């Protein structure tokens, strides 16, 4: 296995080598979403100048799909990046340049919409790094952010995979649960009592839809905050329009919840 030297310094949270293998092992027990074949097609196909966008609500298997896909690729050529709110596109592109020079050709970037400047700078991923021969797969819960990026920066430069809708047939196959009541109770997501199919970080969260409070928490984190995050960052907030006053008063979340 070829690993970065000890002197290699990254500006974001980059995982390679044995760490990458550990991530792959963590999801080995899970079945694959039906959309996994679309992700496979992108990674194996010729899509120069395009990136793959994996988006959808929390707990619909996005991170698991990334880990399952990278487990099928040469570990010495594959890297995983977990974006944090303190990162920006400049830091990310510096790391992508380093990874390219080290021979990495498959890069999976999780929660990329946390970058405050993603919407206005996303084209660098498709126009530069994809054209250089890197296969880049990004994921995130902020569907509105991806939609706005596709409107401008990534117009005709992406292959999109939407994970939010999980048919009952697929739900039953993945969780081996054939109860329509359970499917409805948990909103068609893959998170249930003592079971976390998606992001390992969510393993300690309250179970979504168990009661009114957990349902409200899910809506706040998976929907309301994402909408506000996108409106704030897109073109420096110019699309807030009439929503700005509600946002500044801290009332926008309640309005979205009522809707």
Predicted feature descriptions by range:
Residues 146-259:
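Interdomain motor-coupling "hinge/lid" segment immediately C-terminal to the ATP-binding subdomain
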Residues 54:
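Hydrophobic anchor at the beta1->P-loop junction of P-loop NTPases
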Residues 100-122:
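Conserved P-loop NTPase "ATPase switch" module shared by AAA+ and STAND
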Residues 1-49:
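A short, basic N-terminal segment
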């Amino acid at each position: 296995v070829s690993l970065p030297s000890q002197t290699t310094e990254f500006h974001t949270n980059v995982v390679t080598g044995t760490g990458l293998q550990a991530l792959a092992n963590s999801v080995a027990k899970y079945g694959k979403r039906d959309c996994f074949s679309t992700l496979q097609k992108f990674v194996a196909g010729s899509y120069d100048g395009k990136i793959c966008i994996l988006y959808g609500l929390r707990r619909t298997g996005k991170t698991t799909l990334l880990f399952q896909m990278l487990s099928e690729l040469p570990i010495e050529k594959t890297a995983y990046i977990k974006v944090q709110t303190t990162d920006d596109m400049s830091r990310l592109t510096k790391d992508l340049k380093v990874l390219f020079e080290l021979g990495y050709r498959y890069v999976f970037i999780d929660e990329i919409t946390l970058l405050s400047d993603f919407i206005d700078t996303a084209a660098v991923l498709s126009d530069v790094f994809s054209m250089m021969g890197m296969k880049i797969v990004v994921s995130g819960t902020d569907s509105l952010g991806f939609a706005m990026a596709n409107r401008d920066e990534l117009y005709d430069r992406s292959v999109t995979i939407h994970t939010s809708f999980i048919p009952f047939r697929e739900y039953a196959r993945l969780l081996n649960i054939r109860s329509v009541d359970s499917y409805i109770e948990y909103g068609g997501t893959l998170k249930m009592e003592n079971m976390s199919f998606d992001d390992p970080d969510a393993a300690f969260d309250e179970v979504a839809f168990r009661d009114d409070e957990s349902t409200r928490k899910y809506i706040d984190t998976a929907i309301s905050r994402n909408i506000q995050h996108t409106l704030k960052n897109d073109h420096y907030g110019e699309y807030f329009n009439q929503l700005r006053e509600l946002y500044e008063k801290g009332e926008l979340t309640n309005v979205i919840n009522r809707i």
